[in-house]
A protein has these predicted regions:
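A short, compositionally biased
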Residues: 1-2, 69, 121-122
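A generic structural micro-feature
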Residues: 42-46, 66-68, 86-90, 110-114
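Solvent-exposed edge beta-strands and adjacent loop segments
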Residues: 1-59, 97-108, 146-158
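Short, acidic/charged, Gly/Pro-enriched secondary-structure junctions
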Residues: 64-94
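Beta-strand secondary-structure signal
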Residues: 49-53, 71-75, 93-95, 117-121
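Short amphipathic beta-strand/extended segments with alternating polar/hydrophobic composition
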Residues: 13-18, 86-98, 136-138
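Mixed-charge, glycine-accented linear interaction segment located at domain edges/termini
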Residues: 99-159
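Beta-strand elements of well-folded, non-transmembrane domains
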Residues: 54-58, 76-82, 96-102, 122-127
Length: 159
């Protein structure tokens, strides 16, 4: 990754921070198939958690620490090697709706930078790579779309 920025409700709150977007971890069920077999239950997700690690205590950290729902936008630029061997840059974005799960502790030490790691529960996440949607998950609206395929439409049509 070359660079990144983070926006909270359309306000720039951080540059060049470390963040971890959640993956999709499905709940499972055990079935009998020549013994036990664990199968994923597509549509039932475990908790989705986002972490942001920021250096320093400033208004950006204060804005990220609001005890209410927030809409976060992550933008990052990455280098890619194309099939012909040339290099280029690609822009990526993630739009994430969160609720704070934990406010960061602050360790202060002379001669060291203060590092704060905020943790958030994700209710919606939409990721784009080079302008194409990779994933959209909205837990409260029952949306689960990965690489353009809607995995909840068949379930929602039966409800």
């Amino acid at each position: 990754m070359v660079a990144d920025t983070v926006y909270a409700d359309n306000t720039l709150v951080a540059k060049d921070v470390a963040f971890t977007l959640p993956g999709l971890e499905f709940m499972t069920a055990d079935v009998m198939a020549m013994g036990n077999m664990t199968v994923p239950l597509v549509g039932l997700l475990e908790n989705m958690e986002l972490t942001i690690t920021k250096i320093g205590v400033d208004m950006g950290l204060s804005r990220l620490g609001r005890l209410e729902k927030q809409n976060l936008e992550f933008r990052w630029v990455q280098n890619v090697v194309k099939s012909d061997g040339t290099q280029g840059t690609e822009g990526c974005k993630a739009f994430v709706r969160v609720m704070p799960a934990a406010l960061p502790e602050l360790g202060v030490e002379i001669g060291s930078a203060t590092e704060a790691e905020g943790t958030y529960t994700v209710t919606r996440m939409q990721i784009y790579a080079n302008g194409a949607e990779y994933m959209c998950v909205d837990r409260l609206s029952q949306i689960l779309r990965v690489n353009g395929k809607d995995y909840m439409s068949a379930i929602n049509n039966l409800l």
